[in-house]
Amino acid sequence: MPAISRDEVAHLARLSRLALSDAELDEFAGQLDSILNHVKVVTEVAADDVPPMANPNAVTNVTRPDVIVPGLTPEQALSGAPAVEQDRFAVPQILGEGE
């Protein structure tokens, strides 16, 4: 006996707002039954003695060492700015007063 019936597929199709023909209902019932059987096999294979893992690859974070490098001086950083006020980038106001 299939795990999922044609009526259940029709119900799922209605919930999904899919218009399926009778042939499609029969086809999808068979496909979903096959999928559920494969899932059942996988759940039977999964053993309690196998620890769960988030990633099958044994990859660790590869980071570079922190090295202090000189940054830009304020003058260098502001040299390309179209407008500067009090050693800061000047930008147009986008919010009104009190917002």
UniProtKB/Swiss-Prot annotation:
<dbReference type="GO" id="GO:0006450">
    <property type="term" value="P:regulation of translational fidelity"/>
</dbReference>
<dbReference type="InterPro" id="IPR003837">
    <property type="entry name" value="GatC"/>
</dbReference>
<comment type="subunit">
    <text>Heterotrimer of A, B and C subunits.</text>
</comment>
<keyword id="KW-0648">Protein biosynthesis</keyword>
<dbReference type="GO" id="GO:0006412">
    <property type="term" value="P:translation"/>
</dbReference>
<keyword id="KW-0436">Ligase</keyword>
<keyword id="KW-0547">Nucleotide-binding</keyword>
<dbReference type="InterPro" id="IPR036113">
    <property type="entry name" value="Asp/Glu-ADT_sf_sub_c"/>
</dbReference>
<dbReference type="GO" id="GO:0005524">
    <property type="term" value="F:ATP binding"/>
</dbReference>
<dbReference type="GO" id="GO:0050566">
    <property type="term" value="F:asparaginyl-tRNA synthase (glutamine-hydrolyzing) activity"/>
</dbReference>
<dbReference type="GO" id="GO:0050567">
    <property type="term" value="F:glutaminyl-tRNA synthase (glutamine-hydrolyzing) activity"/>
</dbReference>
<keyword id="KW-0067">ATP-binding</keyword>
<comment type="function">
    <text>Allows the formation of correctly charged Asn-tRNA(Asn) or Gln-tRNA(Gln) through the transamidation of misacylated Asp-tRNA(Asn) or Glu-tRNA(Gln) in organisms which lack either or both of asparaginyl-tRNA or glutaminyl-tRNA synthetases. The reaction takes place in the presence of glutamine and ATP through an activated phospho-Asp-tRNA(Asn) or phospho-Glu-tRNA(Gln).</text>
</comment>
<comment type="similarity">
    <text>Belongs to the GatC family.</text>
</comment>
<protein>
    <recommendedName>
        <fullName>Aspartyl/glutamyl-tRNA(Asn/Gln) amidotransferase subunit C</fullName>
        <ecNumber>6.3.5.-</ecNumber>
    </recommendedName>
</protein>
<dbReference type="GO" id="GO:0070681">
    <property type="term" value="P:glutaminyl-tRNAGln biosynthesis via transamidation"/>
</dbReference>
<dbReference type="Pfam" id="PF02686">
    <property type="entry name" value="GatC"/>
</dbReference>
